């Protein structure tokens, strides 16, 4: 019997999703940024997906950004948020047990002049609340 314990990173697709994705890959394999027919077909699938996600999340379609994966998403979220708030907030708080994509991005932000606070965690990986309080109100 197989036990897959990394569902946070990737999870098996349902058969229904597999069929939809395979159909899209078969029918609309063009570059969605291109102006040719296959590109426009692919862009239709991308826009339709963005609309459905936006509706589900009750946000604007323009707020949906597709990335290649978790690392790119973490970089975009962390760097974008940090740089947008640089004048009002220069301290970032994290832990040493984050995913490498977060730790590497925090190191990059430290090199850009941000103060990075690494909170300690207990044996179960839970943040020590006293350390968090101190980091929030030095």
Residue ranges of model-derived segments:
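Pyridoxal 5′-phosphate
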Residues: 1-138
């Amino acid at each position: 019997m197989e036990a897959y314990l990394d569902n946070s990173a990737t999870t098996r697709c349902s058969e229904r999703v597999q069929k939809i994705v395979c159909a899209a890959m078969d029918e609309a394999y063009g570059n969605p940024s291109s102006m040719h027919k296959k590109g426009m077909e692919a862009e239709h699938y991308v826009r339709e997906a963005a609309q459905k996600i936006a509706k589900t999340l009750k946000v604007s379609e323009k707020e949906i950004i597709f990335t290649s994966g978790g690392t790119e998403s973490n970089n975009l979220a962390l760097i974008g948020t940090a740089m947008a708030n640089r004048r009002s907030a220069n301290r970032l708080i994290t832990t040493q047990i984050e995913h490498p994509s977060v730790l590497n991005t925090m190191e990059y932000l430290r090199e850009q002049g941000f103060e990075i606070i690494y909170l300690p965690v207990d044996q179960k990986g839970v943040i020590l609340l006293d350390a968090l309080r101190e980091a929030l109100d030095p």
